[in-house]
Amino acid sequence: MDQQPGPVQQSSPPNLTNPRFTLELEFVSSLANPYYLSHLAVTYPNLLGISKSGDEGETSNESSDPEAKAFAAYLAYLYSYWKTPEYAQFLTHPGATLRALRLLQEETFRRDIIRPQVIEALAGTGVDEQGAQDTQEGEGEQKQNKEEDAQDAQENTESKT
């Protein structure tokens, strides 16, 4: 009865000898690279809710694709605990990694990362995501607030070391 409700199922503390922990650490660390995000979008468009037919009008693709829903839930699960200082301390690039995980929570971003302009904007901006905001309509302020949250998590991690 000590179980807490919610998506976080990672109850044990982070341990580098735990295969699941190291696998997830490697995966979330890879997300810091915008070109890896591009690779995911091109190679596995179904996971990100991207239409293979190229129809721009299809916006409900994710809701009809169980793989996209499952992957979105997995990304939410990863973000829920990697943003905590206990786990973020293991990230080599916490700002970029948490930014990518946060952005991947948004269906529009998952759908738009197949566009080269979005990837180039992410690659050219580092921690500041102004370029990525230009590619998203009306979500700039929300993204900026979330970026500040990621920076706070990074500062918390740095203060513990």
Swiss-Prot record:
Highest taxon of source: Eukaryota
Gene3D superfamilies with a match to the protein in the record: Mediator of RNA polymerase II, submodule Med31 (Soh1) (1.10.10.1340)
Q: Which parts of the sequence are annotated with region: Disordered?
A: 124-161
Do you know which Pfam families this protein is assigned to? Med31
The GO terms this record gives for MF are: transcription coregulator activity
Query: Where does it localize?
Result: Nucleus
The keyword Lyase is annotated on this UniProt entry: no
Q: Where is the signal peptide?
A: none
In terms of InterPro entries, this protein maps to:
Med31_sf (IPR038089), Mediator_Med31 (IPR008831)
Q: Which UniProt keywords apply?
A: Activator, Nucleus, Transcription, Transcription regulation
| GO terms under biological process | regulation of DNA-templated transcription
What GO CC annotations are associated with the protein? Answer: mediator complex
Report the record's disulfide bonds.
Answer: none
Keyword Zinc-finger in the entry? The reply is no
Subunit annotation: Component of the Mediator complex.
- Which PANTHER family is this protein grouped with? MEDIATOR OF RNA POLYMERASE II TRANSCRIPTION SUBUNIT 31
Functional note: Component of the Mediator complex, a coactivator involved in the regulated transcription of nearly all RNA polymerase II-dependent genes. Mediator functions as a bridge to convey information from gene-specific regulatory proteins to the basal RNA polymerase II transcription machinery. Mediator is recruited to promoters by direct interactions with regulatory proteins and serves as a scaffold for the assembly of a functional preinitiation complex with RNA polymerase II and the general transcription factors.
Family recorded in the similarity comment: Belongs to the Mediator complex subunit 31 family.
Protein name listed in UniProt:
Mediator of RNA polymerase II transcription subunit 31
What organism does the record attribute this protein to? Aspergillus clavatus (strain ATCC 1007 / CBS 513.65 / DSM 816 / NCTC 3887 / NRRL 1 / QM 1276 / 107)
